[in-house]
Swiss-Prot record:
Its cofactor is Fe(2+). Disruption phenotype: Impairs the production of neurosporaxanthin and leads to the accumulation of torulene. It comes from the Eukaryota. This is Carotenoid dioxygenase. It is an enzyme of class 1 (oxidoreductase). GO terms for cellular component: cytosol. Fe(2+) binds at residues 261, 313, 383, 595. Residues 1-25 are annotated as: Disordered.
Amino acid sequence: MSPHEVIGTVPKNSTTFRTQADEHDDHEEALQNLRTGKYEDWPNEAAFDGLTEERGPIKIAVTGNIPTWAAGSLYRTGPGLYKIDTDAGTTFEMSHWFDGLAHTHRFDIIPNEEGSVDIFYSSRRQAEEMMDVIKKQGTWPYYSFGQKADPCLGFFAKAMAAFKGLREPSGEKWHNNVNVAVHVNPPGLEAVRNIVGTRKPAVAENDANVLGHRPELPKSIWVSTDNSTMKQIDPQTLEPIGWATQDVLHPELTGAMSCAHAQRDPDTGDFFNFNLEFGPKPTYRVFRVDASSGKTEILATIREPSVSPAYIHSLFLSPSFVILCIPTSHFGLSGTQIPWERNLVDAIKPYDPSRKTQWIVIDRKHSKGVVARFETDGRFFFHTVNSFEEKAGSDSSDINLYCDVIDFGSHEFIHSLYLDVILNRDSAAKKFYEDEQRARNSLAHLTRYHFIINPDSPTTNLPVTPTPDPKNHEAFRIPAPHAGEIPTINPLYATRKHRYVYSLPFRGRGTITDAIVKTDTVTREALFWDNPKGHTPGEAIFIPRPGGEEEDDGVLLSLVLDGEKGKSYLLCLDAKTMAEMGRAEVDFAIALGFHGAHVPSGRTLTRVEGPEY
């Protein structure tokens, strides 16, 4: 039997089971794949060129069995446009994957009369104003993640940009490229007084005509990125209808930077994030938006010479604490190098192995502010996984705090995400990965950090906890490909002790993620969905089965590019076995995006007591 034998109309993909004993060999094999150019036989160009929007909704073909309890709307966002023909007859091209112009997608999963589901797809571009400006000017007008600056931009233009700072004029907020994470009904932004620059939502009569039983829509959908701007989109039409900066939540949140992955308390719905203000005294303000009142409280203000402004993509939330982890990706000139370089990547200081990762633990229950600080070996990360707490012992008031994160040896990984490397233009991937240390630093690890918190600690002037051997803070570190990027867990286990992490590993077979893996953090076993060659998966979003009592009782939804055919499909995997249950195939390629959110229809997720691990 071939590993992809077709049973009925559903490809039966095999799974691969690996143990902790295989970690080293599998890691070295991934490095060998990079050295030998294994990725050259893994097509993914279709996800980066010739992409269009489909305002639809259109019905797409379903094969196999996607359970009816997965009904709802799956929203996904990410970059989707990389080339723009200008009025001058030239073509402007994005340099970095993260700078592709925003494109949001929706899959509506609707139970039908036959006991299965129908699936409808629609999508819409989110940065048409910026596209128009680029078309007219022939260049990128504002700050970016990694877009290479126009070489014709002179000293005076750079100096003026630095003088103006990072915040666009309010009339130009619509030009902001917001394309990373999806937030459903975030508190504090529902009131009209807090929404700046709103437009009137469009009316989508076609939705009702095509869908019949329209799925339940959320009150609001917002999209975020790594600055302090969020963009609102119509949950039905996907049209951009509003934007807001964090200062509408609190007047002190005036900094230009934040993180794309704010945290939500799974019980109260409270919203947590930070705001980063640059200048002579860079300042982090960690805040909470109360879900019941919509009011914002600043939990901690951190303005110290020893705490550098850094690129931070996500933060941690545990039952008692917000944990701000500051990796090695420090910005130069106290952050003011960003307007000089006009992008984040070039404004980050070169990697320095002597630079430590800083951990700042902030009380979120009793207004104590900063309650602990730690340092660990200098590493870089994009995505936190989860954070949970345990008592240190029956006779101790200390708290064991655990933080799971996908981290890297350095922030050089960011440079592997330039489109030249992803698409291996002029052998750029070969040139990047021929440096073995750089290749090693580009492979992810799932790391669990363990800290001991004394809840009776003073709230100010806390010393950094001495750490003669920073590795003492590591409970474990699981290397790629037994873990990978874009991690997810069962959402019912957020801020609780979890066992399973689902992620997209990098095995060196492609130039970006090339598999889906389920990692058991107790046994360190890894179970892979064995995708066919050239099938590049996106974020695996976990949908719990109603009434399920086991942590892995549910399904995973992942948008996959079939690079061989130049088409995409929505994949449904059994989260326990990693076997394919069904798929919904689209007759064209959909961009490789970043993150999404599933809005269930007809039910509310309920947290249950899970097993003890």
